[in-house]
Each structure stands twice: as C-alpha cells, then as structure tokens.
Amino acid sequence: MAAKISFQRINSDYPNSAIKAPSYLLMVQKDSLSTFFEKNKMANNVTSFYTSCNSTNEYTFSNISSLIRKMSEARKFGMAADPDWTVKHPNWNKVLLVPIQLKTQTSSSTATISGMEHSVGIASTKLVGGSENPYAPINVEIVYGKFNQ
C-alpha cells in the first residue's frame, strides 16, 4: 500500500507582505510532538515526515502508508486490550503539521541534513481544509494491490 496527501496553500491576500510561507513542514503524530523536538529526532518516514512547498503551491507528503498502518495497528491492539481505548487515547489518529527549519552540514560540497528544529521565525500560511472549507476537500491517495486466488 502507498498513501499520499497534499495540502494546497491559499495564497496571501497581501502578496507584498514580508511574512513568507514556511519552507518546510513536519507531519508528526500529535502525541509525539513535544518529544520529537526535546529528543532532537529527525523525520524517519515511518511515523514522521517532512516536505517543502512544491511548484504547484502544495505541501505533499508522499508514502505515509507506514504512519497509517502504525496508527491502525495501535487502535487494533488497544481495542483488543481495552474496549474504551479510543476514548482514553483520543489522539490515536491525529497528526500535526509543524513549520520546521533544517540544520545542514556541508562536506565536499554536499549538504546533509543533520537536524530539524521547530521554526520560531515569522512565517505563515493558510492551508485548504476545515469544516468551513469553500475549496475542494483534502484527498488522501491510496494505492494498493491484491492478488487474485
């Protein structure tokens, strides 16, 4: 299974504004946000992902299937042990999008990402979504295969 989600940016009404959109966004499980930065973690493409704004004005997170699978497994095992598990763990299926800055190290003219920090600079963007969304809904694209027997 492969899954992808894109978040369309809504352009500012003030194009000459000094406030720019975040260069990078981190997708991380809501319950893991504080420990992600406290423990200096990096996006691992399993439970956390990062992306930049692309040429079509979107932040696209590709192949998030491992995250979906981990969340589903946590719910499955949690519910097997405790029927009230989802009530006790209301964020089991929640992620946050957080602006980040990448720390890099350069060696022999090759830059390598050495860390991720919560972006504390002035940046802002508005993404399509929410209950009052006048735009097309956010779609999660899922591709999977199944063998016929």
State what each model feature region is.
Residues 1-149:
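Secreted, disulfide-rich extracellular signaling modules
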